[in-house]
């Protein structure tokens, strides 16, 4: 069981499409099923209109799915029950540190690029907590253990949680449950056995595997695919409109776009137009590049331009 898990914060860009294509091809090449899950945890940036557009864009590309999980914004009771399980085990504590205090600490960075938490609030007494006036976020105590796993693209990985992850937030100060908790609950309860996502999320994997073990769930197999970068080395973002789905759909057919992505993925030697379904028999993880993939400056040359 695989999954698409897009965030409805804008139109998909080329990197999102590339990852979605590989996730779909991997599952379909094994005769597996695909779930769609809308990750709308961020209430400030998520829009229902974007979620509907994501569905249309995936369908336009020929990437179908077999079922859809309820959006994350509707699943707070599920996350609350898992939060309570952590609390019952004494793994949760309130953190009153502001964002500026965390950054002013000049602490080393965690494996996901965030500031490694210093543990300032880890052992506060009940009296010290009662004296705080700020609404707390909630962190989980991580053990000083090594978590090892084999990524399907990046190979063997080992992280020592206390050194590369630190106590991480599972519920924000505004009450919203954090991504790390939500994604583990949803993957486990959705029966997901294979997670394909960008290599920028590799640093989140060890802590998620640890949460799977704490909750007693089997963990999925992970594949962290290379990022697509602009010719000047910049990472793509949804703010760059020239390579998002709105611009691409106005300039090309689904087969043209899939063909160019298949070439970048090593699934065909040239950019010939092809349907996603026709790539299933060619798919192999052995063919996927291991490092960042630079999008050629002439990537869209030859696309059919619609009047």
Named regions from a protein language model:
Residues 1-9, 29, 34, 129-131, ...:
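Non-catalytic terminal extensions that flank enzyme cores
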Residues 100-237, 244-248, 297-307:
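Active-site cores that bind ATP or allylic diphosphates and position pyrophosphate for catalysis
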Residues 86, 113-115, 261:
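Short alpha-helix boundary/capping motifs
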